[in-house]
């Protein structure tokens, strides 16, 4: 939108003539006219249009396949007048506007685009229509009406827009509202810059997320979290309220109420929806009405009277229903993304420091990227502040501090552009879309001919009916711009007054126009008339060249008529960078190229600096060429001196004469020597007779001696052959003898080995038998010792048994005496007529009467039983000694006592007696290996009983005392009636028979072949 003049002047002071001004430096005000940034009318330049004009050539340079590279001009005619030029003496102009680039060109003439292509970019000038009053200002250049200008400005009202959109959304049918929510939700998955093949395959755009929007993973995670809360904690009323909150988010986004300082819009919209849901809630209505009725504030009649005034939507008769799953999913997604965006904005606002406040008024274009800067700094993690310069590029403060303007990467520019685009309201987005579509349409129309056919040349313009005063660019170089022009002659232009100085024209050929570069009269511009072309046959009448330009800089070239000082056209051209390596190294180009022309003073200064740089470069090249020439000349001189020296040294006459005389002398000496040798050869051909005779005698002697030598050689050969035969026979005999000797030695060795083996085997066999005999003897000795030990134990046990039996007999005798005394005492007490107790007979007792008890009952009736005064007792148990294991069995003839044996009579037995006897079953029973297959020893009979089944010994004590045998006797085993004589438990394998005998030590053994028996007999 066009700015006012005051705003333009204030914003113009913050601009630098070569681009964006440094943020930390004071910017000097420009003292030139308003021909900056490619706009001739600096007060009415449109920001959107200028930005589109800057970005369009750069964006289309890589996409158009066929673009002429030698022209760059576009012209817009019939503009508004501007201030006067300081150096060109041009009071007004046509406000012609042209933009040029080395990569593309297009022309705008009265709003209609046309393309000439090729080297001729298109019509860039037009004949000025003179008014009838002779005024220099065109009637079409009148100022714009203020009312008309104000009517074109759309005021930003985000609150009104948001509320209007919210009301509109709430009135839509459910089906249409669902469709709107679906379209809005689908926009969150699309990149802000549009889908492309590169963005679909980029990890940053898919997973990391573009600037201003979360990544795909974050979206899915937030949607899942909100969906979980929706299903678990949200009841029906809350779900319907959240569904309307999604409408609020859509309205805020489309109306632009969520950006800037319009935070109250969110609260207002949410409050409206909340109040509406609270009023519509049946529970709240019942609560309020019941409270009002109970407090008698409103009567039921009044309520029924005014209830029909309420809308039908507020009078609910049934509770709300849950929304459908599709609308629930869309609402969850919209609210989740809204919450994510709010969190990201709050984090970015808290993280980025607030900029310092200054008293200067900030340009609206420069401040448009302030919020973008905050979010971009938050997204990229960089603390470098940035802003959008006037040339449409992002400039960082760190670059200005270093004194250089550095461009940010394309990724950051894309992020910031996406953020600015996302913060635009719905109406601004529609306007931006319309501008973009129209610009693309105009550009496609302008380049239609170039894209379809080959580039056009000047020859293609023959026969075309074009207006007079046509100027076009033919070639753009790093330091020069070449142009051509048509015929400017007319009936009114017969006079040649007011012309500028001509560089190459005569007095009869005046220049119809002159050139101003960036508002300054350009003295190095040359214009020449084409003389060889016939009039009317060619469009080219004038050719010119603008030299002295700097590479990679933007210029505004103005073509002004010489007679009326009116601007024919204005062309904005940017010179390409220099491709010469030497010139690039010598001339330093600015690090940040400017995309708008400089002021006249700056242009002249840059031209002077460029000319001085070229002059210095040429001087340096000249000095370098001089040095190279000096080196080459010195080398040539050295070679010339060498050749002269060789020439002088090779043409000396004296040396040549001496050399020729020397050669002649050598020839004569050689000839003399040859003649002498020939004479000697002639003399040697004639031999004397005496010498011939001597030679024949010597030859005969030699032959005789030779025959003797041959015969001696034959004899020697025969003798050698005979001796060789003898030696061979002897060698054969010797070899046979050696072979026999070796065979005998091998046989002797084999026999010796056999002998040694036999001897060792014999010795080993004897030793083995002796060892076995010694082992057998040792085992028999051990067995004999073991038998003697057992015999001694048996004798000791027998003696102890006899002693115990004698002691037991004595004790039984004492017991019998005690029993007899007790019986006598009882009989005496029974025979006594007195009472049994001092108190008399006890009550309930029946004293015995002598008449009732017969005397025969007081005596014992059976020998095996005992009776005491008519009382019969069972037979007594056997003595404990009778149950113990003893090899001697005996039975006592005395009756046993009915009383228990006293404890002092239990004498401890011998340790040998306490041990299990060798005749006991516990001693015999033991687990055997595979060699002993019986659980009991096979040496004992099957009728051998253990102690639990053994019969008591029936042994008379008198016989035991009468017949005492020795402890080592073998006949004591026969006393046991329950046992039978068995063989010794240690029967040897070598014994053939069995028998009994006694030795001096009391041991017994059997087997006549046993060494132990022999040892026992000898001992």
UniProtKB/Swiss-Prot annotation:
Transmembrane segments: 163-183, 216-236, 259-279
UniProt key word Ribonucleoprotein: no
Region Disordered, residue ranges: 1-94, 109-143, 343-371, 580-603, 831-855, 879-905, 963-1019
One GO cellular component, as annotated: membrane
Locations listed in the record: Membrane
Annotated Polar residues bias: 68-83, 131-143, 580-589
Domain of life: Eukaryota
Coiled coil segments of this chain: 602-788
The keyword Transmembrane helix belongs to this UniProt entry's keyword annotation: yes
Residue spans of biased composition, Low complexity class: 33-63
Keyword list, A-Z: Coiled coil, Membrane, Transmembrane, Transmembrane helix, Ubl conjugation pathway
Sequence ranges of Gly residues compositional bias: 992-1008
Topology in the lipid bilayer: Multi-pass membrane protein
Family of the protein in this entry: Belongs to the acrB family.
Record's function text: Component of the regulatory network controlling carbon source utilization through ubiquitination and deubiquitination involving creA, creB, creC, creD and acrB. Involved in resistance to acriflavine, and required for normal growth on a range of sole carbon sources, including fructose, cellobiose, raffinose, and starch, and reduced utilization of amino acids, including GABA and beta-alanine, as sole carbon and nitrogen sources.
Protein's UniProt name: Probable ubiquitination network signaling protein acrB
